[in-house]
Amino acid sequence: SPEGAASILYKDAGQVERAAEALRIVPMNPAQDFFSAVQSVWLMEMILSCVTGGRDFAFSRLDLALLPFFDAAESEDAQEILTEFLLHCNNIGGMGSELHVHMPVPCAATNIYLMLGGRGAEEALALDLCFLRAALEVRLPQPVLALRQCKDSDSRWKIACAHAAQELNGQVSLYNDDALIPNLIALGMPEEKALHYTMSGCNRAET
């Protein structure tokens, strides 16, 4: 039941009811708010991780996908939701070796990549900063934060990225859009796709 599934993830009665209500809608139907959107992403990523072997995957441009549901005026609630989301990303490592008989991956950990910021995501600044604050609360290995910057990046983003890199050590990688995007275009990638590149695997750029 939705209530049973929700109670696995949430202890507070109000959170359980909120999660149960979201599970009546997502992921079968479109999300209706920020909470149900994040819940839908988590459920799909957890299932895909089990099915495909539980090893190295990325959320693509999750900030842009969640942006239509994000209200900067309610960033405190959004940060709490994202904190729970990032915590759960550390619960699914290594399951592929047990659950996928066709492609078992005997790994003790799964690397998950979350790309934030950069060209084409300027309107997501408040949400991206919220993600970083949540990561600083969690301070666990996953997801790996792939933080995009360019010379025109907002100073608040540059400072927040520098702080995250200092505080979270190996969890943060910085990517230079001014170098990567022109090179992706030179390799034949359409400009729109190059603008929204993300990371998959240790250092592979994809769209």
What does each of the following model-derived ranges do?
Residues 1-207:
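Conserved catalytic cores of very large enzyme subunits
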